[in-house]
Every structure is written in structure tokens, then in C-alpha cells.
Amino acid sequence: MDESELFKGLMNSTAYCSELAKVDIPFYKSIDTEFNENIKSVSSRFMRLIELLLSKVDRSRAEDIVDVEDIDNRWAEVSDTLDILFEKADYSIDKAQGLLKKPAIETHASTSDVANKKPKKEKLPYKVIHAAHLTKPQLRFRVQPNNSREFVWSWKLTEKPHSLVPLEKIIAQVKLDPSLKNSLPHPYEPEIQNSVYPPWVSEMSNPIDTGSVDETEPIWVSTESQLSDMLKELQNSKEIAVDLEHHDYRSFRGFVCLMQISNREKDWIVDTLELREELEALNVVFTNPNIIKVFHGATMDIIWLQRDFGLYVVNLFDTYYATKVLGFEGHGLAFLLQKYCDYDADKRYQMADWRIRPLPREMLKYAQSDTHYLLYIWDHLRNELISKSAERKENLMQSVFNSSKQISLRKYELEPYDPIYGLGTDGWRNVLTKFGSSKIIGREALMIYRALHDWRDSVARKEDESVRYVLPNRLLIAIAASKPVEAADVFSISKQLTPIARMYVEDIVKVVQEAEKLYNEQVDREKSQFKEVEKQNQPLAVFSESNTLGDYKVDSSVFEISKQNRSKLKTLLANGSAFWIEGQSQDDLRKARKERLFIVNQNIPFSLTLPCTQGHVESELNVKQSTVTEAANPSLNGEKKQEPIVIRDLGLNKQKRDSSKLNHKEPSNPIEERNEDIEPSEASTSVSKKRKQKKKKKNSGKLTIEAEHVSNDSPIINEAPFDYKNQKNFIADLDSDVGKNKFGKRGFNPLNKVSLPKRNTRELKKRKVSDGKSTSY
């Protein structure tokens, strides 16, 4: 089989698997035995192939995989192994075809090929993505960030332009209600809720072309005078486009590095690192209800504006929600730029480090393009919303505005660290669920993991670094699972330790050791508590050698309240029934019972405690060496010994009783004749016997398969090669002539869609466009 046929078969298999995943497989397996057997055969084949694949890399890791659950739990290892093998195979194929050798004579592609193929973009240099040796800009901030867990955040707002409710009134309300200090109200909530959009927004208009981004030079704003000039022009605009570039990798809380603002004529790029404390002046424009502020994916932008600059937005239009209402295929800004402007945004710079100064021209142009075309896109979206509203007979424009209002009402609030329950975005519970559910096993590993997670958060706050920079989540899980004893063990876990982790490697080992010590102390404490409870919970012995009745007056009545018998009766019956004790309050009795817990013998689950009689006393005096049971239940005047009531035996299921005994009439006194009617051991014998036979029958098939498997020294490697080319497709056969009846018609095939998968490889490779802006750096 050559490379083209192999690739074709691989693509067909991928297509079938993609379609098969959409079908309710368990349902069809339950109604079609042939389909069930075929699925089992394919699954076992896949299992053996994966085991063979891993064995080529590491035999010890392959032996640990037994079933599908192991693959699910260790899919990261399987995926990494596949990536390594694919890269090596790709490299070997290129080398065999001579693609890696530089040709002696340079060849030039035809003009048609050049026109059809886009040039492949190289990866950005590492220094552009992470400027490791850059001095932290936050060290130059006039107000240093406070990362402590006890810090209470407050508004940065000092004045409130375009207000319906004055700022002083809101501050007075917070002072009167202390509960509002933990969750401050939105200062512009009344203005946002009561905002009315200008009438011209609902009118159709021709989109205003802003020209190419290459034809317009952005204006860099880094001084107060430049900021003032920009404000004057923005106040005369009807609509503006705004975007932010954020960084949160080398900072605990993160900060905004750039702000891009555009109107119909100009593009501004504001250096927010230099003008951090002066940008509150933009509220004059941002809170003006007569100026429409166009954002794309403003969910986080609104939060960052409040946190860093004290800025709030009134009359926001989020183009992301317009794409949702219109039902577009994509919802990202790159999709809109391609759809309306035929502009291919270089998304490599999404991951760039925007702290770099001065900015390279490529990064500057990328930042400018985010807002340069946004007002032109807003014109197109507005026209489509108006036209679609007439077709659907609903106000789609108002729907987008309502969603945008909810985004404007978002508030910035600090997320507290929760060491107990691990709640929150970066809480230990969320990280454990995503990355360590299969690796952190046992109470000790969990305690070490939680201690390391707490330590990571503390160091990140202290060094003003993100938790990902201090200790990535996967490395955190790996350290907690391996339980390093010394620094060398930590370095052996991963070769890519972060600089902070290398600097604090001794502290990491110390945290692990302290967590182990705490766990051992907790285990010892639980063992001692269990022993204490077990010691207190000894079966009650009313009469024993240590509890003799030598000083008890035998010839007197047991129930006679005399000075001689009073103390002895209290000693013997304090743990029995409070009814027989005179002169003690209910509180004293309750306290005595709590101090002395007792359990009934396990052979008698529920028993009735009876008062002592004179027969008990005489028996104890005559036979000192008798057992506890004989002392507590002696024969009385030759009468038949009375057994305690055992509720569990009387409550047995009728099917578990002897069938011959069920035909007899129920005895008048079930307590006395219980042992004659019911034999629990005999009743349960047949049930346990049936279970053993069933289990033996079930395991017989497994033992046969295992015996055959063990007989072969290397069943996977010695197996005959699988003929992929001539393999029968059982899904496609469901629509073949085999299934026709005598009238020449085929029956209903529920897997018809699966047998006709999409063969368009581009569609299979096409990635889903993400919703809006998810992460920024």
C-alpha cells in the first residue's frame, strides 16, 4: 500500500469515526447483536494497536493500560506519544523525498501557484511572546498593586460626569450599609439602565469606508497634552471604536498595556502604562449617552477598564452579540474582518507581550487594525439588523443593545482565595478537576496538592506573578503526585521548571514534607481516637469479677431501697435503665450515658435490657467464674432461658426462609420459638450457593480467554498483519443488497447517515471559531 492509498484509507476512517460519534452507539448495540459484536471487535483491535504503539515507546507504560478507562485517564500520554511519532514520521518522509535538502539550483514557482498559495507565516520570536528580561512596568506605577488576600478593592472613580445619581449619594449609601463594602454597587447602573440610543442608530445608511490600515498612520498617545488633544476630537464624534491589549502572565492581577481608539478619521494608540492614572478623564466620552461605543467581545474589557482606570461605558454596542443574533457562522473579529473588509488579521500577535517598548511596527499595525475597520463593520451589522428585523418581525437591534447593556453592568470584584473548599477560577478544586483527577489519588496526595496550591498562590501574590508563571498546573499536579523528598527529585520531575520554581525549590520540598507530617499526625490522631472509642465501647457486663457483690445483702429484696443496697444498685444499673435508679436527675443520667457508651453484642443486634433479680445475685455468688452471658441471663427456677428479641432475624424475607417452615402456623410467642422456626444460616445457604455458581459461570469465559492470551509470549507483536485494504466495512454493508427482502426492498437502516460520511477533508480539518475574545496577554 503506497502513501496515497494509506492517506485515503486514513481519511475515510476518520470520516466514518466522526459520523459514528454522532450516533447513539449504546442504543444500536442493544437492538442489533451483529452491530454490537462488530463494535466490540473494532474496539479490541484499537486497544491492541494503542498498546502496541505505546510499547514501541515504553513497554512499562503499555502494560498499565487494561481497558478504555485507562486510555481516558491517561489520554495526555497517548496524545503526546502520537505527536512524537507523527513528527518523526513526517520528518522521515520529508527526508526520504529529499525535501530537507537544499536544491543545488533554485527553482521558481509559477505565477499561478504563487497567486493561489498564501505565504506560510513563521512563528514569532520568543522575545516577542515573552520578554523575559523586561523590567516590570508595574514597578513604575504611581499606585503599586496590592495582591494581599485581605485587600478590599474600591472604586478608582473620583468624579462622575453625565450622572443621573451623584457619586456622593452612592458613597453615602455604602457608608450606611456596611454589607455593600464587600460588593460595591455599580456607580453608573442608573445611567446604563435608563440610557436611550440616538434615533439615527435605527436608520439604514451606506457604510463609510475607512480605507486601508496601511494608508493610515496611528497616533501614539503617551503624554497628558496628547491625551487632551485626543479627547477634544473624540467629544465631537457620534461613534467610536475601542479595544484593549491586556497582559496577565507576569502579573498576579494583570494590567492593560494598550488602548486603541478610532473614529471616522483617525486612529489613536494610547500607552496605558505611562498614562495609567490620567485616563479617568476618558469618562467624559465613555459615559456620554450620545456617543456610541463599539467594542468586539467586551466581556473582559469592561472589567479591565474599571479595575485599572475607573472607566465606565454607557451606550455600548458589542459586535459579538450582533453576530450571534444574525446567526453568523463565525463570531470572532477575524471572521468579521475577512467577511466585510477582506482583511486577513495576523493573529500571531494575539499572544504577543504588549509590555514591550518601543513596539515593533508589526505589532503597532496589528493593534491599529483591531479598531480601524470596526466602525465600517458596525455600519454593515447595523444595516443587516434593521433589514432582518423587518423579515422576522422583531427588533433585533434592541436585542443586541440589551445584551450590550448587561455587559456594561458587569462589576469588577476581587475573587477571594478559598483554601477549604477550593472554589474560584484558579481554586484548587477546579484545577484538580481539569488536570489531576486521575493522578492525585488518596488523602495524602490530596493534602500535599492543596498545600502546594496554597503555597503557589502566596508566592504569586508576593512576587506579583501569575500562578501559571510560578508553577504551571500540570507541574503542580506532577509534584504533588510524586512527593519529592529533596530538591533533586523536583528537578527530575520536569526539565522545564520556571525560574520562580527553581528559586523556591527548597521551599517546595519543605511544603511537601510538612504536608506529609501533617497527614501522619492526622492519621495517628484518628487511630488514637478510634482506639479510645473502641475501648469505651466494650460489651456491657453487669456482673464481673471486678464488680462483685460480696457486700450485697442477699436476704433483702432487690427492690428494697436501703442504705446498704442503694450504692451497689447505682453502680450496677447506671448503664442499664434510668427507671430503676432513684435520686438522680435526668441531666446526670444523660451525662453518665454519654460518658460511658456501650454496644450490644454483635450476635444480638437489638436486645431488651431487663432489671436485676434476686436470681441474678444468687447465681453470681455461687458461680464466680461463669461467663458474662451466663451471669447476665441465668436460669430462673428451672424455667426455660429467655432469649432477647432479634429484630433482624424476624425481618428476614420470606424467600430466604425454609419453605417447609412457612406452611406452619405462626407461633403465638415468636420470641420463645424463634430458633425452631428460622435458621438464618440455612436460609441464606441456597442464595449464596446460587451467587457462587453464577459468578463461576461468568468468569469461566474470561479465564479461557486469559489462558489463550497467556499462552502466547507476545500476542501483539506476533499477530498476523491486519489487511486494511480488504477489510469489510460492516456499516456500509447495512445498505448493500444483502439486506434486501423477497420484494427487492431493503429494510430501514438507522445508520444510513454514518455510512455516507462527509469526504471533504477541508471540512474535517476546519476548526470552530471561538466565541469572542477569550484570552489576552
Swiss-Prot record:
<feature type="compositionally biased region" description="Basic residues">
    <location>
        <begin position="688"/>
        <end position="700"/>
    </location>
</feature>
<dbReference type="GO" id="GO:0070651">
    <property type="term" value="P:nonfunctional rRNA decay"/>
</dbReference>
<dbReference type="GO" id="GO:0003727">
    <property type="term" value="F:single-stranded RNA binding"/>
</dbReference>
<dbReference type="GO" id="GO:0071037">
    <property type="term" value="P:nuclear polyadenylation-dependent snRNA catabolic process"/>
</dbReference>
<dbReference type="GO" id="GO:0031047">
    <property type="term" value="P:regulatory ncRNA-mediated gene silencing"/>
</dbReference>
<feature type="binding site">
    <location>
        <position position="304"/>
    </location>
    <ligand>
        <name>AMP</name>
    </ligand>
</feature>
<keyword id="KW-0378">Hydrolase</keyword>
<feature type="binding site">
    <location>
        <position position="347"/>
    </location>
    <ligand>
        <name>UMP</name>
    </ligand>
</feature>
<feature type="binding site">
    <location>
        <position position="370"/>
    </location>
    <ligand>
        <name>Mn(2+)</name>
    </ligand>
</feature>
<dbReference type="GO" id="GO:0004532">
    <property type="term" value="F:RNA exonuclease activity"/>
</dbReference>
<dbReference type="GO" id="GO:0000178">
    <property type="term" value="C:exosome (RNase complex)"/>
</dbReference>
<feature type="binding site">
    <location>
        <position position="370"/>
    </location>
    <ligand>
        <name>Zn(2+)</name>
    </ligand>
</feature>
<dbReference type="GO" id="GO:0071038">
    <property type="term" value="P:TRAMP-dependent tRNA surveillance pathway"/>
</dbReference>
<feature type="compositionally biased region" description="Basic and acidic residues">
    <location>
        <begin position="655"/>
        <end position="673"/>
    </location>
</feature>
<dbReference type="GO" id="GO:0000166">
    <property type="term" value="F:nucleotide binding"/>
</dbReference>
<feature type="binding site">
    <location>
        <position position="246"/>
    </location>
    <ligand>
        <name>UMP</name>
    </ligand>
</feature>
<dbReference type="GO" id="GO:0071051">
    <property type="term" value="P:poly(A)-dependent snoRNA 3'-end processing"/>
</dbReference>
<dbReference type="Pfam" id="PF01612">
    <property type="entry name" value="DNA_pol_A_exo1"/>
</dbReference>
<feature type="binding site">
    <location>
        <position position="350"/>
    </location>
    <ligand>
        <name>AMP</name>
    </ligand>
</feature>
<keyword id="KW-0539">Nucleus</keyword>
<feature type="region of interest" description="Disordered">
    <location>
        <begin position="743"/>
        <end position="777"/>
    </location>
</feature>
<feature type="binding site">
    <location>
        <position position="301"/>
    </location>
    <ligand>
        <name>Mn(2+)</name>
    </ligand>
</feature>
<dbReference type="GO" id="GO:0000175">
    <property type="term" value="F:3'-5'-RNA exonuclease activity"/>
</dbReference>
<feature type="binding site">
    <location>
        <position position="245"/>
    </location>
    <ligand>
        <name>UMP</name>
    </ligand>
</feature>
<comment type="similarity">
    <text>Belongs to the exosome component 10/RRP6 family.</text>
</comment>
<dbReference type="GO" id="GO:0071039">
    <property type="term" value="P:nuclear polyadenylation-dependent CUT catabolic process"/>
</dbReference>
<feature type="domain" description="3'-5' exonuclease">
    <location>
        <begin position="219"/>
        <end position="385"/>
    </location>
</feature>
<feature type="domain" description="HRDC">
    <location>
        <begin position="442"/>
        <end position="522"/>
    </location>
</feature>
<dbReference type="GO" id="GO:0005654">
    <property type="term" value="C:nucleoplasm"/>
</dbReference>
<keyword id="KW-0269">Exonuclease</keyword>
<feature type="binding site">
    <location>
        <position position="243"/>
    </location>
    <ligand>
        <name>Mn(2+)</name>
    </ligand>
</feature>
<dbReference type="GO" id="GO:0140602">
    <property type="term" value="C:nucleolar peripheral inclusion body"/>
</dbReference>
<dbReference type="GO" id="GO:0033621">
    <property type="term" value="P:nuclear mRNA surveillance of meiosis-specific transcripts"/>
</dbReference>
<dbReference type="GO" id="GO:0005730">
    <property type="term" value="C:nucleolus"/>
</dbReference>
<dbReference type="GO" id="GO:0046872">
    <property type="term" value="F:metal ion binding"/>
</dbReference>
<dbReference type="GO" id="GO:0005634">
    <property type="term" value="C:nucleus"/>
</dbReference>
<keyword id="KW-0698">rRNA processing</keyword>
<keyword id="KW-0862">Zinc</keyword>
<keyword id="KW-0271">Exosome</keyword>
<dbReference type="GO" id="GO:0071920">
    <property type="term" value="C:cleavage body"/>
</dbReference>
<dbReference type="GO" id="GO:1990342">
    <property type="term" value="C:heterochromatin island"/>
</dbReference>
<dbReference type="GO" id="GO:0071042">
    <property type="term" value="P:nuclear polyadenylation-dependent mRNA catabolic process"/>
</dbReference>
